[in-house]
């Protein structure tokens, strides 16, 4: 008769206790829509484009969600704030 195998904590190890490897799901890298279109400046009067980067609550979407590069995210933030200031965009959602 063989004795059951034990791990380093002196617990019995069963073959069903072996962990299966977990597949790592890699997210697709988002590309900046403004870099693709070769936009130099983001226009604060283009409300339709700015609305795509605002959440349903009226908050500006972060880079990790919108996929913008740092340069265009800064320009986008300034453009949204300017559009809000002159009442083209709401500060909060309805």
Swiss-Prot record:
Keywords: Ribonucleoprotein, Ribosomal protein, RNA-binding, rRNA-binding
Example of a GO MF term: small ribosomal subunit rRNA binding
Keyword check for Ribosomal protein: yes
InterPro entries: Ribosomal_bS18, Ribosomal_bS18_CS, Ribosomal_bS18_sf
TM spans (from-to): none
Cellular component, GO, one term: cytosolic small ribosomal subunit
Matching PROSITE patterns: RIBOSOMAL_S18
Organism domain of life: Bacteria
GO biological process, one term: translation
Gene3D superfamilies for the chain: Ribosomal protein S18 (4.10.640.10)
Role: Binds as a heterodimer with protein bS6 to the central domain of the 16S rRNA, where it helps stabilize the platform of the 30S subunit.
Subunit: Part of the 30S ribosomal subunit. Forms a tight heterodimer with protein bS6.
Entry's family note: Belongs to the bacterial ribosomal protein bS18 family.
NCBIfam families: S18 (TIGR00165)
Protein name from the UniProt record: Small ribosomal subunit protein bS18
Organism: Acetivibrio thermocellus (strain ATCC 27405 / DSM 1237 / JCM 9322 / NBRC 103400 / NCIMB 10682 / NRRL B-4536 / VPI 7372) (Clostridium thermocellum)
Gene name of the encoded protein: rpsR
């Amino acid at each position: 008769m063989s004795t059951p195998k034990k791990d380093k904590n002196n617990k019995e190890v069963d073959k069903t206790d072996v962990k299966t490897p977990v597949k790592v799901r890699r997210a697709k890298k988002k590309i900046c829509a403004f870099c693709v279109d070769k936009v130099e400046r983001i226009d604060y009067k283009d409300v339709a484009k700015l609305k795509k980067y605002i959440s349903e609550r009226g908050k500006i979407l972060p880079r990790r969600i919108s996929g913008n590069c740092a340069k265009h995210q800064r320009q986008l933030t300034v453009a949204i704030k300017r559009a809000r200031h002159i009442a083209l965009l709401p500060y909060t959602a309805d």
